[in-house]
């Protein structure tokens, strides 16, 4: 199979193939242009994988450009986190990081060119009046009384805006297009507004800032972008994108192409709503493992490879759709099943005493991965007192229950066969200790008399156990589409985080943040980067061993 045949295919790649075949372009140059006013989420990951992936596959270039035209909402903290997320996902931008603010002088010059051509004017309507004059989807707008100012007056007023002669909201520069256009975006859109705010890149040099629609297309052209890819909500904006480039003196005219944005069940992607979750402390920050942010997914234990695989599987189309959470979870589950070393941890512990076990203990050998001998093995301490999970024992049970039952046998993982003899309870009737006997000749082998022991449970030696906090994360919302609720905060899942105190095998004291483990029979977990200490490790559940979403949907 050739390199071209091995590539994923979608309508954007078909356009690129046609452009290259026809000679319209000889190379491919894309860009990823986030606004640095928040943390990237899984939806941005789709755009990152698309833009950087195309550049990678076609041996072209992809720029990282920050659309930093609103100093009030932006911060260098977001710039740094976005760069980190792009690199963590496995991509590298072409050349230096770029900023729309790099082009403020050129953008200002192009605004003056539009004024000189009679295609832009300074408007002194209030923001409320501008909205009122704009009209509706069914009614045309009406012209501003300031629309027919002379070129000379507009130039003077625009210079007054630039030098701080107007208060915020008292004047703006608008394109002179058509107030009766069926497309509201073309009804004399604002090109520049006044903001007396310090900019994280340009300081206090400017008090006028260009709008996204004016900045974006010119930045693309100045950088030689061949294919400007954005989500479907910018479809109507393409008309303004083309209008600006058609009416200024610039040699390059990129084309904009739209694809569907990523919608994921049981979460929200709106930056405003995500910000509300953080500021109202429904979550502990932008990197909370329940958040759909890349930093939250990373802290939860998602790998870059699993997110790239997810973006590959959902594909690129023009149809908006909502992706099931199971699709995302299956990608990380497959990745970790293949690559995560195994370990034992008991999440809901109950003491088990082996009454006929002699000696202080021994070491048993366990494979780090059942199907990958190259991952080696480890020595795990075993003793006569162990912790098992409370759910792995019943005093009475039917034949379907394959774990430990009073009077019956079960195998301890990679250790011995044990038999439950009796229990001890507290005053409330809760089991505090299970007393067992063991068959000393069954260390990692079947009983000599041929009897069959079907169940296998995991365990941790009590004398060697590492106390751990285990955070069981679940979906953040209790309904598939929380954004459709009258109050999305009212459908937050109260069980989205359950904290347990358990015990783990001592090898996990060497765990590092970002490396996942399969806790045998429990799920996939990783060390929490924020709350863990050497004395008390904290592990986050990344995903369960099986798909729990099928049941949720029933």
Swiss-Prot record:
EC number, UniProt record: 6.1.1.18
Q: Does the keyword Cell membrane apply?
A: no
Say if the entry is tagged with keyword Acyltransferase.
no
Span(s) of short sequence motif 'KMSKS' region = 268-272
Keywords annotated in UniProt:
Aminoacyl-tRNA synthetase, ATP-binding, Cytoplasm, Ligase, Nucleotide-binding, Protein biosynthesis
Q: Which residues cross the membrane?
A: none
Q: Which InterPro entries match?
A: aa-tRNA-synth_I_CS, Gln-tRNA-synth, Gln/Glu-tRNA_Ligase, Gln_tRNA_ligase_bac, Glu/Gln-tRNA-synth, Glu/Gln-tRNA-synth_Ib_cat-dom, Glu/Gln-tRNA-synth_Ib_codon-bd, Glu_tRNA_lig_a-bdl
Q: Where does ATP bind?
A: 35-37, 41-47, 231, 261-262, 269-271
> Region Interaction with tRNA: which residues?
317-324
Residue positions binding L-glutamine: 67, 212
What is annotated about its quaternary structure and interactions?
A: Monomer.
Name assigned to this protein: Glutamine--tRNA ligase
Q: Whose protein is this, by species?
A: Escherichia coli O6:H1 (strain CFT073 / ATCC 700928 / UPEC)
| Lineage of source species | Bacteria, Pseudomonadati, Pseudomonadota, Gammaproteobacteria, Enterobacterales
Query: Which gene specifies this protein's sequence?
Result: glnS
């Amino acid at each position: 199979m050739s390199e071209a045949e091995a590539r994923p295919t979608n309508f954007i790649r078909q356009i690129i193939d046609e452009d290259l075949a026809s000679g319209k372009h000889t190379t491919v140059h894309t860009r990823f242009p986030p606004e640095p006013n928040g943390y990237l989420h899984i939806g941005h990951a789709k755009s990152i994988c698309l833009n950087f992936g195309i550049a990678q596959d076609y041996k072209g270039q992809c720029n990282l450009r920050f659309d930093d035209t609103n100093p009030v909402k932006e911060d260098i903290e977001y710039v740094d986190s976005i760069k980190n997320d792009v690199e963590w996902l496995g991509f590298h931008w072409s050349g230096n990081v770029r900023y729309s603010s790099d082009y403020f002088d050129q953008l200002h010059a192009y605004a003056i060119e539009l004024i000189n051509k009679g295609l832009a004017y300074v408007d002194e309507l209030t923001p409320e009046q501008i909205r009122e004059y704009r009209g509706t989807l069914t009614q045309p707008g009406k012209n501003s009384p300031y629309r027919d100012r002379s070129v000379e007056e507009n130039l003077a007023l625009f210079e007054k805006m630039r030098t701080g002669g107007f208060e915020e909201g008292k004047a703006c520069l608008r394109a002179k297009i058509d107030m009766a256009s069926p497309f509201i975006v073309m009804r004399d859109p604002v090109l520049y507004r006044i903001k007396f705010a310090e900019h994280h890149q340009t300081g206090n040099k400017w008090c006028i800032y260009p709008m996204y629609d004016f900045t974006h297309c010119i930045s693309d052209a100045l950088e030689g972008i061949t294919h400007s890819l954005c989500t479907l909500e910018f479809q109507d904006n393409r008309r303004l994108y083309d209008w600006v480039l058609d009416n200024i003196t610039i040699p390059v005219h990129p084309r904009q192409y739209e694809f569907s944005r990523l919608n994921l069940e049981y979460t929200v992607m709106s930056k405003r709503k995500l910000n509300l979750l953080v500021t109202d402390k429904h979550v502990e920050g932008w990197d909370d493992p329940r958040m759909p942010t890349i930093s939250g997914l990373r802290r939860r234990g998602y790998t870059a490879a699993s997110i790239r695989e997810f973006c590959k599987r959902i594909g690129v189309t023009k149809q908006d759709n909502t992706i099931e959470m199971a699709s995302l979870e299956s990608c990380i589950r497959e990745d970790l099943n293949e690559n995560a070393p195994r370990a034992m941890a008991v999440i809901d512990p109950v003491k088990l005493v082996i009454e006929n076990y002699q000696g202080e203990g021994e070491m048993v050998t366990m494979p780090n991965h059942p199907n990958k001998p190259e991952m080696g093995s480890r020595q795990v301490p075993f003793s006569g007192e162990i912790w098992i999970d409370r759910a792995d024992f019943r005093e009475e049970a039917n034949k379907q229950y394959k774990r430990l039952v009073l009077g019956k046998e079960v195998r301890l993982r990679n250790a011995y066969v044990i038999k439950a003899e009796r229990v001890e309870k507290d005053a409330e009737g809760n089991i505090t200790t299970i007393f067992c006997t063991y068959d000393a000749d069954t260390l990692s082998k079947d009983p000599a008399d041929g009897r069959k022991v079907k169940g296998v449970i995991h365990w941790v030696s009590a004398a060697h156990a590492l106390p751990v906090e285990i955070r069981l994360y679940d979906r953040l919302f209790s309904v598939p589409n929380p954004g459709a609720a009258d109050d999305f905060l009212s459908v937050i899942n109260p069980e989205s985080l359950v904290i347990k105190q358990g015990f783990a095998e001592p090898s996990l004291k060497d765990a590092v943040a970002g490396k996942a483990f399969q806790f045998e029979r429990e799920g996939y977990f990783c060390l929490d980067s924020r709350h863990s200490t050497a004395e008390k490790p904290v592990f986050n559940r990344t995903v369960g061993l099986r798909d729990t979403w099928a049941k949720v949907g029933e």
